[in-house]
C-alpha cells in the first residue's frame, strides 16, 4: 500500500518544477494587474502576481538553508511574504513588485526562523525527552 504522504524531497522537487511553468510578467502586464488588484480587488490579478513571483520566493528561501529548517517550510513562509507584498504594493511608486516583495519575503522567512530555530534542540518525542 502506498503512503498517503509523498516523499518530502520529491514533493519539493515537483513543486519547484511546477512553479517554473508560471510565466514571468512584463513590466506593463505587472502594472496592469497591480492596478486591477489595487482598484477593484480583483483576486485573479492578485493570483497572477503571486504565481509569477513564486520562483523569487524559492530562490530567497533556499538562501536560508543553513538554519537546519525544512526548505519547504521556508518556502511556505516566503509565500506568505509574497502575498503580503502583493496586498500592500503600490504600482504608482515606479518600481517592480519583485523589488518590493523581496523585503516582505525575507521578513516572513526571518520571523519564521526566529520562532522556530534554537541553539538548544528540544526533544520532540517521548524517548528524546526521557534522555534528560
Predicted regions and their residues:
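Alpha-helical promoter-recognition and RNA polymerase-docking modules of transcription initiation factors
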Residues: 2-132
Amino acid at each position: 500500500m502506498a503512503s498517503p504522504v509523498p516523499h518530502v524531497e520529491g514533493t519539493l522537487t515537483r513543486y519547484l518544477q511546477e512553479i517554473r511553468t508560471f510565466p514571468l510578467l512584463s513590466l506593463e502586464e505587472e502594472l496592469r494587474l497591480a492596478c486591477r488588484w489595487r482598484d477593484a480587488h480583483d483576486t485573479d490579478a492578485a493570483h497572477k502576481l503571486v504565481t509569477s513571483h513564486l520562483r523569487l520566493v524559492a530562490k530567497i528561501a533556499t538562501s536560508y538553508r543553513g538554519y537546519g529548517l525544512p526548505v519547504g517550510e521556508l518556502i511556505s513562509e516566503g509565500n506568505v511574504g509574497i502575498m503580503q507584498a502583493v496586498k500592500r504594493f503600490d504600482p504608482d511608486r515606479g518600481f517592480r513588485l519583485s523589488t518590493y516583495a523581496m523585503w516582505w519575503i525575507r521578513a516572513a522567512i526571518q520571523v519564521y526562523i526566529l520562532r522556530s530555530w534554537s541553539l538548544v534542540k528540544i526533544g520532540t518525542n517521548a524517548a528524546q525527552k526521557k534522555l534528560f
